[in-house]
From Swiss-Prot:
InterPro entries: KH_dom (IPR004087), KH_dom-like_a/b (IPR015946), KH_dom_type_2 (IPR004044), KH_sf_prok-type (IPR009019), Ribosomal_S3_C_sf (IPR036419), Ribosomal_uS3_bac-typ (IPR005704), Ribosomal_uS3_C (IPR001351), Ribosomal_uS3_CS (IPR018280). This is Small ribosomal subunit protein uS3. Pfam families: KH_2, Ribosomal_S3_C. GO terms for molecular function: mRNA binding; rRNA binding; structural constituent of ribosome. PANTHER family: 30S/40S RIBOSOMAL PROTEIN S3, SMALL RIBOSOMAL SUBUNIT PROTEIN US3C. Belongs to the universal ribosomal protein uS3 family.
């Protein structure tokens, strides 16, 4: 069943942290819907800015949003104009004070969402799916990945019956919890319908941080 579980959720609390860092009792549903609105707005507004992860933190009446992107210049804009417009829009959307932090992705070829999104955009441009997968895997391996697996599902090449094509290079140890595996699921809108693109990238092992236990002799 290790092939079925979401690799990101499987590693939360071991080597991964939550993308939403807040706690609420009575307002949980309200905050959750607010998070979904924020993520949907950012992903729509910055569709061409290679945005990967969006982290949301909350403190009192303040919302801190960290946007991980491969194109920080496009998000920030000339003199910070674009990010300021985005901040104002999120302020109006949530009715709270929003602070935006831009985090640059140094190696976009090691980010599963950006790689999967690249494959999806190629499929929409009618590039052969095997070629799109092969080129993406080669770029990722050259960038320093230990392994990559890509899966494309749907009416490939407009076939009447949908099928799944999986290609892999290197190793992708899904059962090893200390393995840093980035996972993403993306969609390609083609003339024959939607194609699903799944991407797993193994970036090496991460040793979980051990808790410091300084107690001695029953103290």
């Amino acid at each position: 069943m290790g092939q079925k579980i979401n690799p990101t959720g499987f590693r939360v609390g071991v080597i991964r942290d939550w993308d939403a860092k807040w706690y609420a009792e009575k307002d949980f549903a309200t905050f959750l819907h607010e998070d979904l609105k924020i993520r949907k707005y950012i992903n729509t507004k910055l569709a061409d800015a290679s945005v990967s992860t969006i982290e949301i933190e909350r403190a009192a009446n303040r919302v801190n949003v960290s946007i991980h992107t491969a194109k920080p210049g496009m998000v920030i804009g000339k003199g910070g104009s674009e990010v300021e417009n985005l901040r104002k829009a999120l302020n109006n959307l949530t009715g709270k004070k929003v602070h935006i932090n831009i985090v640059e992705i140094k190696k976009p070829d090691l980010d599963a969402h950006l790689v999967g999104e690249g494959i999806a955009r190629q499929l929409e441009a009618r590039v052969a799916f095997r070629r799109a997968q092969r080129q993406a895997m080669q770029r990722t391996m050259r960038a320093g990945a230990k392994g990559i697996k890509t899966q494309v599902a749907g009416r490939l090449n407009g076939a009447d019956m949908s099928r799944i094509e999986t290609h892999a290079q290197g190793t992708v140890p899904l059962h090893t919890l200390r393995a840093d595996i980035d996972y993403s699921w993306d969609e390609a809108m083609t003339t024959y319908g939607k194609l699903g693109v799944k991407t797993w990238i193994y970036r090496g092992e991460v040793l979980p941080a051990k808790a410091n236990n300084n107690t001695k002799g029953g103290k």
